[in-house]
A protein has these predicted regions:
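NAD(P)+-binding Rossmann beta1-loop-alpha1 motif at the extreme N-terminus of oxidoreductases
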Residues: 1-51
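Rossmann-like NAD(P)(H) cofactor-binding subdomain of soluble oxidoreductases
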Residues: 53-58, 62-102
């Protein structure tokens, strides 16, 4: 399943990590700027405090959702104040299923 997680904050990163555990999923994380560069270079590092472990996931990243990009699922994990900017981008995209998290 091709999955995009739109937003690389705490929720988005945890969701991307969880979805990536199923090897049938091809997870792409939409991140921008310096944070995208860190994920590309070092992987998505999560420190799990309760489990007392650290995981590093290598996954695809992108900094844009183009209208012609098609995913089976798009999880939207942006902050409420960012939705007004994100909704036109989602509307222009050809993917059918959008799940808003948060």
């Amino acid at each position: 399943m091709r999955i995009l997680v739109y937003g690389a904050g705490v929720q988005g990163c945890q969701l991307a990590h969880s979805l990536a555990q199923n090897k049938k999923n091809v997870v792409t994380l939409l991140a921008r700027g310096e944070w995208k560069a860190v994920i590309d270079q070092k992987g998505l590092t999560i420190r799990h405090m309760l489990q007392r472990k650290t995981t590093v996931d290598r996954m695809q990243t992108t900094d844009v959702l183009a209208p012609e990009d098609v995913y089976d699922l798009v999880f939207v994990t942006v902050q409420a104040g960012q939705l007004a900017d994100v909704l036109p981008i989602l509307k222009a995209n050809r993917s059918q299923y959008f799940i808003f998290v948060g």
